[in-house]
Amino acid sequence: MCAQVWLLTDRLIREDYPQVQILRALRQRCSEQDVGFRAVFLDQIAVTVVGGHLGLQLSQKPLTTFPDVVVVRVSTPSVQSDSEITILRHLEKLGCRLVNRPQSILNCINKFWTFQELAGHGVPMPDTFSYGGHEDFSKMIDEAEPLGYPVVVKSTRGHRGKAVFLARDKHHLSDICHLVRHDVPYLFQKYVKESHGKDIRVVVVGGQVIGSMLRCSTDGRMQSNCFLGGVGVKCPLTEQGKQLAIQVSNILGMDFCGIDLLIMDDGSFTVCEANANVGFLAFDQACNLDVGAIIADYAMSLLPNRQTGKMAILPGLASPREKNEPNGCVSAQGVAESVYAITNGSTSSESEPELGEARDSSVKTMGAPPAHVAQAWLQH
């Protein structure tokens, strides 16, 4: 029986750069290796229990065989346990190997849930408070007093650096109360001053660090996200930083992810966030990588009678030039040098006004013309 691979995503994000790149790479590899391939939208699937047995319908047609591996790309800020996660759990119970698994995605869709999972494992994290009720933000102002000021305030379901505030003092925090959405809880987090406006994005695939990027704010704001106008540059990471990112990925059970590390004065790191549906346009550009292809190779390695994912992706991760580069430490001096490089042309930006153009340019370079993207999703 022919092995099958699916790429499963939301129709609304199908034309985003990561989905296009993974689609291209999976289709190519499945064609070359005589493996069945489908690109599937979540809204095409119906899950069934008939006669006490699990079943699956695709576009209203019952399936008699199921995919061996499913690469999942869902918009984590909007993921709901009674909709998207229900479908993912069903596929997993049918014996499909999901990349990432539903529990791993759940571990990351709420920022406080991530910290709950990491707690007790010796992972360095900023002290963090949160609450249960959606209307309890104002009640937490006094509770969060031990964190000191300024204090970081984040939506537990925020993404791309949105819904993040830095409250200068208690009065400022009270003012923020009138600005926040009250449909999700917020968290209050100790401010890491030395990492203001900068962090390290580390991408992990199959339990291995494939690259790291220094992200820097260009307007003085605390968030360094490229989506908000920050810029990124390839940045070597210490062994301690790599092991921390891998540890976080393993604890959360993720096959591929982005780990954001804050930089301490002594060169050590503390974990800021983990992303199960990591974007990688700016990362590909800064690090000269094709993360979509690496994810596809890892997914193919999980098919029956294949090598383990770890063995399969080791040989091609670094180019000869990258292999000869020193594995330098991200220190205060290293950060300063990287920022200087950023401001002198070695930049990658994912700010909103340029995102569409950057995405289209990159997709053309990688071999998937944007005009044909929608049609590509219809070719099963």
Swiss-Prot record:
Residues found modified as Phosphoserine: S319
Reactions it catalyzes: N-acetyl-L-aspartate + L-glutamate + ATP = N-acetyl-L-aspartyl-L-glutamate + ADP + phosphate + H(+); N-acetyl-L-aspartate + 2 L-glutamate + 2 ATP = N-acetyl-L-aspartyl-L-glutamyl-L-glutamate + 2 ADP + 2 phosphate + 2 H(+)
Annotated GO biological process: protein modification process
Q: How is the cofactor bound?
A: Binds 2 magnesium or manganese ions per subunit.
Per UniProt, subcellular location reads as: Cytoplasm
Which residues are in the ATP-grasp domain?
A: 115-300
Q: What is this protein called?
A: N-acetylaspartylglutamate synthase A
Q: What class of enzyme is it?
A: ligase
> What organism is this sequence from?
Mus musculus
**Residues annotated for Mn(2+) 1 binding in this entry:** D260, E273
